[in-house]
Regions:
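C-terminal transmembrane-bundle signature of multipass membrane proteins
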Residues: 106-113, 127-178
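Small-residue-rich segments of transmembrane alpha-helices in multi-pass membrane proteins
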Residues: 37-49, 96-110, 158-169
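Single conserved hydrophobic/aromatic residue that forms the stacking wall/gate
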Residues: 1-13
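C-terminal ends of transmembrane helices
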Residues: 15-28, 78-94, 142-149
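Structural signature of hydrophobic alpha-helical transmembrane segments
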Residues: 9, 37, 58-73, 124-133
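Active-site rim beta-loop-alpha module in soluble metabolic enzymes
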Residues: 71-121
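Cytoplasm-facing juxtamembrane segments at the starts of transmembrane helices
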Residues: 28-36, 61-66, 86-102, 150-155, ...
Length: 178
């Protein structure tokens, strides 16, 4: 039962490596950015599959369907708000929409299943908190990657703070799997 979560964690580590390499090899920026997106998507899919495998109660399907719908709305909303938020996703538009859906789904699904269980399952609670921190981190990061005039020191500090908090919470959630 723990294997999908471990693979998810490993894929997220790869994401960090790919995205760091884009700063070293600037001429290959796009391939490293796409690789980072892809690794994170795959990692989150493993986290989501682990959550569904372990905690889903298919007779309570609303706790699964509702997070999917909300995540789709978040992804479409991100696309609709590109211009008003002065963002330019360019060639990364499609993968950004997919990425937004998957990251939102991890947060909303773990939160929904935590709610279904009365917030009594620490793995789900920590995964939910970690998912929220990932979403916040990525909102900040999207501004620094795709926004106008959003590479301020405060953005970099808050991005790293929320990102590492997310990593810590999700990794900690594995300790409570039974």
């Amino acid at each position: 039962e723990i294997m999908p979560s471990l693979v998810g964690s490993e894929m997220c580590i790869r994401d960090s490596i790919w995205l760091d390499l884009k700063w070293i090899y600037k001429e290959d920026n796009d391939i490293y950015t796409f690789s980072g997106f892809f690794s994170f998507i795959v990692g989150h899919i493993f986290f989501i599959s682990a959550i569904l495998q372990r905690f889903a109660e298919w007779d309570k399907i609303i706790y699964i369907v509702l997070p999917v719908v909300i995540s789709l709305i978040a992804a479409v909303g991100m696309l609709i708000l590109e211009k008003p938020l002065k963002m330019n996703y360019g060639k990364f538009k499609v993968i950004t929409v997919v990425y937004t859906f998957i990251v939102a789904l991890l947060a909303f699904l773990s939160g929904s299943l935590a709610l279904m269980n009365g917030f009594k399952i620490m793995t789900l609670n920590l995964m939910f908190a970690g998912g929220i921190f990932f979403a916040l981190s990525d909102l900040i990061l999207s501004g620094t990657y795709f926004g106008e005039n959003k590479k301020r020191p405060i953005d970099i500090i808050t991005n790293h703070t929320t990102y590492y908090a997310a990593q810590f919470l999700i990794a900690s959630s594995l300790m409570f799997l039974k």
